[in-house]
Amino acid sequence: MANKKLAFQDIILTLQGFWSKQGANLMQAYDNEVGAGTMSPYTFLRSNGPEPWGAAYVQPSRRPADGRYGENPNRLFQHHQFQVVLKPSPKNIQELYLQSLAELGIDALEHDIRFVEDNWENPSMGCAGIGWEVWIDGQECTQFTYFQQVGGIEVDSVTSEITYGLERIATVIQEVDSVYDLEWGNGVAYGDIFKEPEYEHSKFAFEESNQELLLKLFGEYEQEALDLLDKGLVHPAYDYILKSSHTFNLLDARGAVSVTERAGYMHRVRTMARKVAKTFIEERAKLGFPLLKDEALREKYLGKKGKYTKIVEGEEK
């Protein structure tokens, strides 16, 4: 690889090129506020059910409580994740990940790369899995997970998720201490694009957000999501679940909910997440699981009545 250090946008292009060759569909960032790439429907919804799936995409991820007014060198209201989800998981997925780092110029012989066991979960969305944090030269840069549950439902097929923290990967590659000193591309600094929005979003989240409005919106988003799910409209419903989740995160950052109330809000989001995951599988079953090419397996999962049948250790459930 050339000595010139990759700009932020070139890191994205390199990862897109690498993972598309491994069978991942290159998706675009989902156009709704999410706290992580996992919450995109390209991961959350598609990880359940028997259909194979592969996707890779950049996802801007908003975490209001992590805002630091643009003053912290690596903690942000909004950061960027490069998300890879492969179902079923390739047996050599860890090897592929290391190859992707090599494509970025991060040689395992020249850098300290460690897989630190870290079983991951997202309680509010009912997601959990076994996996590792990947540390490069002393900082966490990637989360590597084999999903066990999504939306509170046990997955049918082992699904692997790789979440690159792009800002942290970029600081390793460009050898800078602050994300704001990164080159985004064409000589433009990361800070020239994102430092002002970081300050403004932090000020909004911690000082200026309208708590009464947010409380009202959460309830309205929740009701709309549940109404849409009753009508079998999975994707519009999921949009409102994401809005509910982000609204809760804004309330939490503002200190507008107590510890007890916080648990209650998380339970409400988790209830919606479980319902949308279940409904998504049911709707895909009505279509005959079109991405499932194995006819015998399709028939097994659809059962005798053409409805989704959970398979557990070779038996129907």
Swiss-Prot record:
BP GO annotations: glycyl-tRNA aminoacylation
Subcellular compartments: Cytoplasm
Molecular function GO terms recorded: ATP binding; catalytic activity, acting on a protein; glycine-tRNA ligase activity; transferase activity
Record keywords, A-Z: Aminoacyl-tRNA synthetase, ATP-binding, Cytoplasm, Ligase, Nucleotide-binding, Protein biosynthesis
Enzyme Commission identifier(s): 6.1.1.14
Pfam families from the UniProt entry: tRNA-synt_2e
Catalytic function, reaction form: tRNA(Gly) + glycine + ATP = glycyl-tRNA(Gly) + AMP + diphosphate
GO cellular component, one term: cytosol
Enzyme class at the top of the EC tree: ligase
Quaternary context: Tetramer of two alpha and two beta subunits.
HAMAP family (UniProt xref): Gly_tRNA_synth_alpha
Family: Belongs to the class-II aminoacyl-tRNA synthetase family.
Name of the molecule in the record: Glycine--tRNA ligase alpha subunit
